Amino acid sequence: MRSNNNNPLTRDEILSRYFPQYRPAVTASQGLSGGSCIIAHDTHRIVLRRHHDPDAPPAHFLRHHRALSQLPASLAPRALFYTPGWMAVEYLHGVVNSALPDADELAALLYHLHQQPHFGWRIALSPLLAQYWSCCDPARRTPFWLRRLKQLQKNGEPRPLRLAPLHMDVHGDNIVLTSAGLRLIDWEYAGDGDIALELAAVWVEDERQHRQLADAYAARARIDARQLWRQIRLWHPWVIMLKAGWFEYRWRQTGEQQFIRLADETWRQLRMKG
């Protein structure tokens, strides 16, 4: 279902106009952010998501909806409704664990995603990193950040090993163990890109866990494990800068202390590695 209304509506207007029998049930839950909430009618639940990034064009939010509309139920929740500024998404019943699944299970899930048809838009990190620099708190801009940014821009993004649709925000809180298996939620950063970029961006605990995931994926995808790991390492500087920039970006938007702490820790990691 899609609305033709061109003006963003408030949450209460969305509920009264399109979901009159539903009431807010849970807010700020796992996998939800920026004013999104769960609405319920009796035992039936729906996730109501709001376009919460003022610096992102509306087209980015529409892409999120299109990605969910395109993906099979074996990977993601169904998209149910869209109007400018809002979408409604199927609520997945299951268990969310902050820890990642074991390497074989996660590799199978990601390989299944990467076998799907392309979304139709590419993930480009260089302009995204530049946006994070320009939109961050000016007091947080450092010569070190600028040097690293310019070095990456000079080198250019690695040549893709294999293009596929990517999720790009894989961590424990975005994986739901349902009765039918693992599913991914929170697809707002999805797009087409290198499979090694996806694997580089997974929020792993340490290099050992990362290597286990890479090896499990290589076996499933029939890719040389050493070649895949080399490609993942080529993407690593980009991913670390992406995370640092995103934390800075969210700090400027929200003022929440967790983001500044995460940004500081990521910058420390970058400085230690030179």
UniProtKB/Swiss-Prot annotation:
The keyword ATP-binding applies. It is an enzyme of class 2 (transferase). Gene3D superfamilies: 3.90.1200.10. It comes from the Bacteria. Pfam families: APH. Coiled coil: none annotated. GO terms for molecular function: ATP binding; thiamine kinase activity. Pathway: Cofactor biosynthesis; thiamine diphosphate biosynthesis; thiamine phosphate from thiamine: step 1/1. Catalyzes the ATP-dependent phosphorylation of thiamine to thiamine phosphate. Is involved in thiamine salvage. HAMAP family: Thiamine_kinase. Belongs to the thiamine kinase family. This is Thiamine kinase. It comes from Salmonella paratyphi A (strain AKU_12601). The gene is thiK.
